[in-house]
A protein has these predicted regions:
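Short, small-residue alpha-helix embedded
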Residues: 327-340, 476
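N-terminal membrane-proximal hinge/A-helix region immediately C-terminal to the signal-anchor transmembrane segment
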Residues: 5-15, 20-53, 57-154, 159-163, ...
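Cytochrome P450 heme-binding "Cys pocket" and the immediately downstream C-terminal segment
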Residues: 343-345, 466-503
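Cytochrome P450 heme-thiolate "Cys pocket" and heme-binding signature region
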Residues: 149, 163, 318, 323, ...
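Cytochrome P450 heme-thiolate monooxygenase catalytic core
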Residues: 16-19, 25-39, 46-48, 63-71, ...
Length: 522
């Protein structure tokens, strides 16, 4: 039985929803997200859907009824397997349709579970911030991730999670990240020097992924990724494909099955790759260890070998390597597509970069001045979040969510990909408009609840590496546009987003490159 196909994401948005927060109707735009100026460029893959009225709880509902009823949702059919099949084929498209039909809280009865999908920012914050101590991550989802991540901070719970996060936090603080900017810039410069100055059909996604891998390798292991980049990318794609196909079904076939040979090989390659880095470092004298993440983890091991076993060190290295480059590579890939399909916005950003940097490599002092670049990255992450759906949470005790009193063991699914394309919070939600973040900076934007833009999550489990990811994306993007003009190749079609742990194009993105006259190349 071969694994299921990767999930296609429709991102069909709904507008004009009336919620418990009042009537927030705004018309949806029918304009394309990424319609490029050149006639040869393809239209955006995300089409809007006509709004449908939500069915929120009625105000006259009695307190007793509200405390016991589930939110509205689709009919489960036979044990809910039909719902599960629809979600596995088109997750966000299906969730968007259900939100249009049932509102911002959707009850799914998939035997033996009760699951509530939450797409309202205030309700999401109520859960992930206000009631975080009542939530644990979904056991099945964690078991899928644990195949590769072991017992790292990504999958741990309770006191083990708190201890690991506290130990790792200093390495990802804003101050620590700022000190790493020269290494980020050096990695970007080395990669860009190998890129052609002119190409009609450049493998942009592959190049950005290799660059992001190289950066995290330098920060973690003080060495370049080198010839391992291509093998690592292939192994990660295979493991991600397998993990995503296993994510939706409660039972999975053992890895020993013949059709899982590629998954076994990919897992073995990645584990061997990380183990090799650890063994090489342990072979060096402690006094010669560089100041990087691996050295920090090994010092924790030397200080408390029971709490920080060598396997725990390997687990954290695996998570840092995978999470540390996947979000950046995914986000930069979609940003490059948005830039290629919006030449005027691209030129404005490039002009700002030239004005601020004058051909120099960016430093920590330069980054705050690159505001238009920052807005373009924020808008690309709004349209194409690397994690459009968060790992489901289970409540360990009854929780109050809006008007509903939900019992212990209820599962909650959070969908940032829907909230970030909601016309109530983002007018013309399918249109690439970096200026909306400029207006937010100037307090001119319509009041949008906190959490309506959350590409890194929110609450105590917010992404540990968000400062590193944001800084790396800014440095790399600035250096790309210093040198190159991006456009869509002749006859190319728009990329189709698929979710395989992170959001990626179904086929690797390729762009046309042109050198910018007078650009820095050294």
């Amino acid at each position: 039985m071969p694994p299921a196909d990767p999930v296609t994401l429709s991102f069909k948005t709904t507008g004009g929803v009336t919620s418990e927060h009042g009537n927030m109707n705004r018309p949806n735009s029918t304009q394309d997200t990424c319609t490029p100026a050149p006639s040869n460029a393809a239209s955006c893959p995300f089409a809007t859907q006509a709004p449908q009225p939500a069915q929120a709880p009625q105000p006259e509902q009695s307190e007793q009824t509200a405390s016991t009823a589930w939110p509205p949702g689709p009919a489960p059919g036979l044990m809910g397997w039909g719902l599960l099949r629809r979600m596995s084929r088109d997750l966000l498209g299906t969730l968007a349709q259900w939100r249009g039909e049932h509102g911002d809280a959707i009850h799914l009865r998939i035997w033996p579970e009760h699951q509530v999908v939450v797409t309202d920012p205030e309700l999401v914050r109520e859960l992930l911030v206000g009631q975080h101590d009542a939530l644990v991550r979904w056991e099945h989802g964690i078991s899928v991730f644990a195949q590769l991540h072991g017992h790292s901070v990504l999958v741990s719970e309770g006191q083990p999670w708190r201890s690991k996060r506290q130990a790792l936090l200093p390495a990802f603080s804003p101050k620590a990240v700022q000190a790493q900017i020269p290494a980020l810039a050096a990695a970007a410069q080395a990669a860009l020097q190998a890129w052609p100055q002119q190409s009609e059909d450049f493998p942009m996604e592959q190049a950005l992924t290799a660059l992001a891998m190289d950066v995290i390798m330098r920060l973690m292991f003080s060495g370049a990724i080198g010839e391992d980049a291509r093998s690592a990318e292939q192994a990660i794609r295979e493991v991600s494909h397998a993990a995503h196909s296993e994510f939706y079904w409660p039972l999975r076939w053992p890895d020993a099955m013949p059709w899982k040979r590629r998954k076994r090989r990919a897992l073995a390659w990645l584990r061997s790759f990380i183990d090799r880095q650890v063994r090489l470092r342990l072979a060096q004298a402690d006094a010669h260890w560089p100041e990087d993440l691996l050295s920090r983890l090994l010092r924790l091991h030397r200080g408390d070998a029971q709490a920080w076993t060598l396997q725990a060190v390997r687990d954290e290295c695996m998570t840092a390597f995978l999470a540390g480059h996947e979000t950046v590579a995914s986000s930069l890939t979609w940003w490059s597509w948005c830039m290629a399909t919006h030449p005027e916005a691209q030129q404005q950003v490039a002009d700002e970069i030239q004005e601020q940097l004058q051909g120099r490599t960016p430093t920590a002092q330069d980054l705050p001045a690159l505001r238009q670049l920052g807005w373009s990255l924020q808008e690309a992450m709004r349209l194409y979040p690397a994690a459009p759906v968060l790992i489901s949470r289970r409540c360990t005790r009854p929780v109050q969510l809006g008007p509903w009193r939900l019992p212990a063991r209820t599962l909650f699914m959070i969908a940032p990909g829907l909230m970030q394309r909601d016309a109530r919070w983002f007018p013309q939600p399918d249109v690439f408009q970096p200026q909306r973040f400029a207006d937010a900076d100037k307090d001119r934007a319509p009041a949008a609840p906190r959490g309506s833009w959350m590409p890194f999550g929110t609450g105590p489990r917010v992404c540990l590496g968000q400062h590193l990811a944001s800084t790396e994306m800014t440095v790399v993007a600035a250096m790309v546009l210093q040198r190159l003009r991006l456009s869509v190749p002749e006859g190319a079609s728009a990329p189709r987003p698929v979710l395989q742990v992170t959001l990626r194009p179904s086929t690797p993105l390729r762009l046309r490159l042109q050198s910018r006259r007078g650009a820095q190349t050294g």
